[in-house]
Amino acid sequence: MSQWQFKLFEFDIREELETDKNEFIPGRDTKRFIIQMYGIDENGKTACIFVKGFNPFFYVKVLDEWDNSKVTEFVAFVRKEMGAYFGDSLVSAKIVYRHKFYEFDNKKLYKFVQLKFTSIGAFNKCKNLWYNETKYGEDRKLKENGLEFLDTKTTLYEAQVPPLLRLFHIRQIKPSGWVALKNGHYSQNRKQLTTCDYEFTVNYKNIYPINDERLEKICVPFKILSLDIEASSSHGDFPLARKNYLKLATNIVDYLINNNIETCDKDLLSNLIKTGFSYRINKDIEKIYLKKSITEEELDELIDNLVDIKPGKKENYIDIKDEDENSDSSDIENDGIVEEFTTKKRQKVTGTKNKDSNILEIINDLTCNRNTRILELAKCFGQHNPNRDNKWEGKFPELEGDQVTIIGSTIRRNGEDKPYLQHAIVVNDCNSIDNVVIESYKTERDALLAWTNFVQRENPDIIIGYNHHGWDEGFMYDRSIELNCMTQFSKLSRFKNEKCIKEIFQGKNKPKKITIEESSTKLASGQFDLRYFKMSGRLQIDFLNLFRREEQLPSYKLDYVAGHFIGDNIKKIEYDENCSILYSKNLTGLSKNDYIVIQEIGYSTDQYANGKKFKVLDIVDDKIILNDKITPDTNKILRWCLGKDDVGPQDIFRLTNEGPEGRAIVTKYCIKDCDLVQDLMRKNDTMTSYDEMSNLCWVPKSFLVTRGQGIKLTSYVAQKCREKNTLMPVIDKGIDGEGYEGAIVLEPKCNLYLKKPVACVDYSSLYPSSIISENISHDSKVWTKEYDLDDNLINETGEKDENGKFIYDELPEYDYIDITYDTFKWIRKTPKAAATKVKSGYKTCRYVQFQNNEKAILPSILDELLGARKSTKRQMKNETDPFMQNVLDKRQLSIKITANSLYGQAGAKTSTFYDKDIAASTTATGRKLLIYAKELIEACYDNTIEETTNYGEVKCYGEYIYGDSVASYTPIYVRYNKSIIDICSVEELAEKYGNGWHLESPKEYCELNNIESWTENGWTECHRVIRHRLAPYKKMVRILTHTGLVDVTDDHSLVKNTGEEISPKDVSIGTKLLHCTMSENESNIESDISIDEARIMGFFFGDGSCGIYDCPSGHKASWALNNSNKELIEKYYNLCKSVYPEFEWKVYDTLNSSGVYKICFNKKSGSKSKIQFIEKYRSMLYNKKSKIIPSEIINGSIELRKSFWEGLYDADGDKDKNGYTRIDQKSQISAAYICWLANSIGYKTSLNIRDDKTDIYRITATKNKQRRDGDKIKKIVNIQNSANIQNSANIQNSVNIQNSVNIQNSKDNQDYVYDLTTENHHHFAAGIGNMIVHNTDSVFFTFNLKDLDSKEIVGKKALEITIELAKKAGWLATMFLKSPHDLEYEKTFLPFCLLSKKRYVGILYEEDPNKGKRKEMGLVLKRRDNCAQVKDVYGGAIDILMKDQVVHKAVDFVKHSLQDVIDEKISQQKLIITKSLRSYYKNPKQIAHNVLAIRIGERDPGNKPKPGDRMEFIYIKNSDKKALQGDRIETPLFINENNIEIDYGFYITNQIMKPLQQLFALVLEDMEDFVTKRGISMKSWKAEIDKLHEKWTEPDKFSKKYEELRCKEVKSILFDPYIKLLK
């Protein structure tokens, strides 16, 4: 052929000897690194390509001063450190210049030395020089100063990248792509070392990738072998290839416990042991099977020796299975092999009080737990030594293990539907089976070797199975050792005569451990141990392991998985005589003569005809023809699924021993399982998925199968670093106990939304886009600064110059952004307590922003990925070839998974590019964006008129669910018409500057015109003021810093000095909040007020009064200045005469009666009215009852303001001991004016409140430096609103809370709280002083639609409009975001029931308002440990609420259902609960279904449930009130046979009640029985809520108790009547 082309699929690393004769030279490393590439051409011919000439290498960072001579010295030093054996294998060292991956350095190039090696052994030996020496099994740590050479630190780079992957990167070879050999630059091997069709040797520079669209469309015909074995079981339990005495020890100890035998003497122990050896009879002791029988006399001698053994003298270890008895294995199941997929726990056998105790003393020591007694006894018999090839060590004879009986294999070519060969190797005779090739052998040994020959003969490319890595291959390997044929059996590789085993070095003077590949897979469900053969040239895929990683399934049993994937909905059913014709869409995996089960899916899933399996007569197009006439319930969703053969473990063991006919049944079952795995592989198109992920991340498919996602991301990042001339350092695993705030989950507003559609928008690729938009990357991070909770700088990173200035900060050619996140530590309160996550401070990271849209490495990677995914999805739309459509779909999915994994991997401590700051900065940006989206949408659709496509203009009232920020009397600083500054209460804004309140509902809005609010960014446009009544459960708190005071609700209303929002619940004494001193008015408006009049007005503000009022003697008016200082009174008396000469002024001595002198006036004849003068003062210096500073002075000259201040000080000021000016006020408005005035004339102010009189506000002013940090909180005070709030809320730790404040609000607005919306993220200055506050956010948004006549729009019309507006809202939000952020419309719910985080149900609509489907998450409908009746009742209630939207109708349905339970109208099938039986429990008597299993074994030994069996049971009545759970359940069959009463009450109180309580608690106030009970006024209900507040003052605890109270109320009105009937 003109050019050899192959698609790669598997790789192996080998080393050959250097010399021509391939001779081993003692004392010298003569091996050379070789890569074996296995490929296949389009005709199915395989090739092994030996790639030579590539030397593994890594880099060492050195000083810039190094030259070639220094490198030469360094190489000599390293060779010496490597030792004589490996030293000469370091063959190359050269200086290169590269960028480094961590920290921004303005693209500086650093000096590195590249070290190359001839062998992987030398590569590792040299790499280890940078690590500290560790004991075997310990994690290695890098040396703190690297490898020191001549007092110089050298740092290791890129040694974490496997040389195989390095070759891919250099040669641009995709590991699952096509390659070609350069003509004339390769040799074809005549004498082949492998069993491939072709074999080549080529230099790595002469193999290159092919990017050919024609080849990409070829489905290469891989030969795929599916494996499954069956084995015998001597005890009827799970087969064990090698057995010890643990089973006998367990039987003995349990016998003693169950029979309450406290003292076991030698005779009893001897009899129990002899029972196991069949010399005695005892039904509780199972027989053991020996490899070689012994006489009773020989056994007596062994027992005599055993009772004298003192096991505590030696440390001894034994593998046991450890499972949490409180967990339910219903979520984690296996194909009859539960035992092999439990987490192994290596236990040191301890627990005896005396190490000198013999085994009898240990057995009788009741202080020892059951496990210790069993394990101590078991080790006295003997055990296999794992460090000596599992050799048996012990006095007692070795036991016979269970045997392989059948090895099934089916082989299919990739792209074909069915296997072309079905093959079985059977021990002993077996009847023939249609289309199955059967080989029978007399011995197990011959059968094992026959399978090796079969593999070599058929030569598959891929071997698949279902848990064959967890059990089948390991079991066969162990049996081959037992049968002394391991060497021959293990020759399964494509490399001729290669044994697929490995030798593990265990230390000097210790024998090497011989084993097969062993690894562990850690998943959420536990750690799973894998053992399998590494077969060179054959890719292996274990589908159980694959599905555990990638699919969330209720069960992983093969029959369930097959039914889950191989099945589809039934569209319709037709009949032809006695046959049924089922129409369905996807029939992949189903064949003629298969069996299917019909499912009826409602709230629970019922098996039609009790799960009967129907034979498939034929398949025609999209039609399944059955041999029966079926009539399922067509009102439910109907689904067919593959029905796996019903052959249980016990049946397999029995049939195998029943002769050729029985073995044929088991063999057929075995072959069917092989076929099922083939079907699953084809249905899921596993090869295409692996191809795409492999090529994307530059890793072989085998890496994806056997290794975690870390290696694929390491490869991907390393390849991208290579493109940017950048090197990754080798780093240690993260070990600190610190953390950061993870991805945000917004607090839900739990409720039942029946009439208003609830829209949902979502960011497209939120976290990858956050990295791109903010340029978050290792190489863009300039510095970090970490602070504790007291704002003390505790750590910083980043390169500084000799003056301590960051070198790469504030460079003129770059912009920078800061991202702040909270830091946490895991702390144990006591040494034995569980560690809890506690906030420890915060950290700010600065990232550089490059010019011209250039990106750092991580953002550029993600930018490329997101772009590639969009491009791939566009290709999919235009592609017509189904094969390529599927390829492209798998490709875009691989891209999505990789992009979403990158930021998480950066935060994983085991990652090769770990950097907590990257992950934390990403989630912090994500939180910020989510909050932005909510605020923008709510603000932009608040009281607006929107144009819609089909309904014209509609009114929008985007629902604000802001945290009710401030009290009605709170001072607000505003500016009108960009010129006039005003200070007024927040409730006055609408009156003074608004156009009236709108939307008379729980929330009211008032648009503001030409108003700005003061913020940290200066004057910012203020759009509207919002108010609503304070809910009874809401709490208010006063926050006092040294320079600010504000009364707020306990929602997110404050802002930290870093700009981050914070709730009053989370602050404490010392927390720094955001403040910003208001600037003086630059407009300086002209005024008629003179300097002297301003002083009089200041004095009046401090101690003056005036008013017009009616009294019994008639209409009166008064005006007075008051003071006890005679000299001051004389001074202001003369000032008044001068400023107001039109009046007659007098001084009255009221010192004895009032304690002051008074200055008053009378009208002169012909002068202006006294009342006019008083009205002027009232209008200028009063706001209702509070004194204010006239606008003319606030906005006037500094001379006017200073004069007013002097008058104020004369009247009401004094000096403290430090000489500071001090003024007290009773009004927040007045105090706010004084603070502003003082600041405007150059004073610094501080605030305080008195402990005895908390409504007195003290302002202290000075022009000196203030002693304390003005931004820190110094007091947190509860507020009692006499109009509404009766209880005191504990917002913070009680040591930080002062006494409560009693606030009297204005009568009209006594229970309102207020918020502002501004352009500055809703920040605004509020309260006394300089504090900036913030309002909060909602979880969902609804548009509260109305037509132009203000009539509410609901139902389908509202749904259609909501979908349209939600799309516009997403587009609007995206307009103001950095690229590539895109806020996309996702879905709309109507109705919607939100129970809690990630627990909801609703009718989901996407684009079409006519196409809705029920969507649910986290509900009991999904849980498998609930009986079907729970799902039916709960689902029925949900259905009524969703469809009919009538609460009382749902209540009636539940009542009717409860009555049916009491009346025993419910079928037993609806009450059955199922759980899987495990092989081991710590406390077996506490596991109900395990107790039932024991009970079944006692009454029917032949049918005792075994580990892996799924037990069905129903709760029954038991007259003993102290009966444990195990005595309160029974099997349905036993209940019927013995007329046992079912405990229906249990199902109401323990199964049905709790989920329905949570559901109806959401609509409690809409339940008619609740209104009847509590009355329309709900006074008693509100009183209970108040009591709850008093008892549970912490918000989180209150919320929990409040929910419990609501659930309790539901129980009392809905369930208690029926519970009483049961009693």
Curated annotation (Swiss-Prot):
It comes from the Viruses. Coiled coil: none annotated. It is an enzyme of class 2 (transferase). SUPFAM superfamilies: DNA/RNA polymerases (SSF56672), Hedgehog/intein (Hint) domain (SSF51294), Homing endonucleases (SSF55608), Ribonuclease H-like (SSF53098). One of its GO terms (biological process) is intein-mediated protein splicing. InterPro entries: DNA-dir_DNA_pol_B, DNA-dir_DNA_pol_B_exonuc, DNA-dir_DNA_pol_B_multi_dom, DNA/RNA_pol_sf, DNA_pol_B_thumb, DNA_pol_palm_dom_sf, DNA_pol_type-B, Hint_dom_sf. Its EC number is 2.7.7.7. This protein undergoes a protein self splicing that involves a post-translational excision of the intervening region (intein) followed by peptide ligation. GO terms for molecular function: 3'-5'-DNA exonuclease activity; DNA binding; DNA-directed DNA polymerase activity; endonuclease activity; nucleotide binding. Keywords: Autocatalytic cleavage, DNA replication, DNA-binding, DNA-directed DNA polymerase, Nucleotidyltransferase, Protein splicing, Repeat, Transferase, Viral DNA replication. Pfam families: DNA_pol_B, DNA_pol_B_exo1. It catalyses: DNA(n) + a 2'-deoxyribonucleoside 5'-triphosphate = DNA(n+1) + diphosphate. Belongs to the DNA polymerase type-B family. This is DNA polymerase. It comes from Chrysochromulina ericina virus (CeV01). The lineage of its organism: Viruses, Varidnaviria, Bamfordvirae, Nucleocytoviricota, Megaviricetes.
